[in-house]
A protein has these predicted regions:
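Alpha-helical transmembrane segments of integral membrane proteins
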Residues: 38-45, 75, 116, 120, ...
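Selected transmembrane alpha-helices and immediately adjacent juxtamembrane segments
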Residues: 65-115, 145
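Membrane-interface alpha-helices at helix entry/exit sites of multi-pass transporters
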Residues: 8-15, 108-119
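Transmembrane helix exit motif
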Residues: 1-7, 45-69, 182-188
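Alpha-helical transmembrane segments of multipass membrane proteins
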Residues: 25-29, 82-86, 102, 106, ...
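Selective hydrophobic functional segments
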Residues: 1-38, 126-172
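Alpha-helical transmembrane segments and their membrane-interface exit regions
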Residues: 48-55, 102-108, 151-156
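Hydrophobic residues within alpha-helical transmembrane segments
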Residues: 14, 18-22, 45, 52, ...
Length: 188
């Protein structure tokens, strides 16, 4: 993965991951039924907006500005990731794009570091949401293992490929994925 290629944002990723974990516990406990069609349309719009914001981020962020990972910026990031964790525990869908938006614009990370940090945060906060749903007997292990294996393999492969190929390939796959998923969510 990323660490084997020398990409790590530890301890920053651990701190924000723990705050996201606490948020996900709250979000998963607040989870309620939402009409699927309305939810899918809202999600497709959110995904497109977040992707556009990442791709069209202000030019000032394209420069050589230092990352913001310590001090008051770490504190602000922890608070925001608690809120992101609530959303992740409640809905989860599109969470990767929300995390990418914040890390790239506020923390000024390049997309390779964004993806490395996102992977750690999602791993940590998913534990809280999973345990909440498990204790409420809402886990389908057949689907879960299938999805988990695909995510694990895909994430490992993508991490190695993105470090090798850089930010440009991440942007390409981000656009393709969001367009296809948004189309599916809106029309199907």
């Amino acid at each position: 993965g990323y660490r084997s290629k020398g990409i790590s944002t530890y301890p920053f990723s651990a701190y924000i991951g723990v705050f996201a974990l606490f948020g996900s516990l709250l979000g998963a406990n607040l989870a309620t039924d939402i009409d699927d069609k309305i939810f899918n349309k809202i999600l497709s719009i959110i995904m497109i907006i977040v992707t556009l914001l990442i791709l069209l981020s202000p030019k000032v962020l394209k420069g050589n500005l230092p990352e913001r990972l310590k001090g008051k910026n770490l504190l602000k990031s922890c608070i925001i990731f608690f809120i992101i964790g609530i959303y992740g525990g409640f809905v989860n869908a599109g969470i990767g794009l929300v995390i990418m938006l914040f890390l790239s614009i506020y923390n000024r990370m390049n997309l390779v570091k964004v993806n490395a940090t996102k992977s750690v945060v999602i791993l940590i906060y998913t534990i809280g949401a999973f345990l909440t749903f498990l204790f409420n007997d809402l886990v389908d292990f057949g689907y879960g293992f299938s999805l988990g294996f695909g995510t694990l393999f895909g994430g490992w492969w993508a991490s190695r490929y993105s470090v090798k190929k850089g930010e440009r390939i991440i942007r390409f796959f981000l656009i393709i994925t969001v367009v296809l998923l948004s189309f599916k969510l809106w029309f199907f």
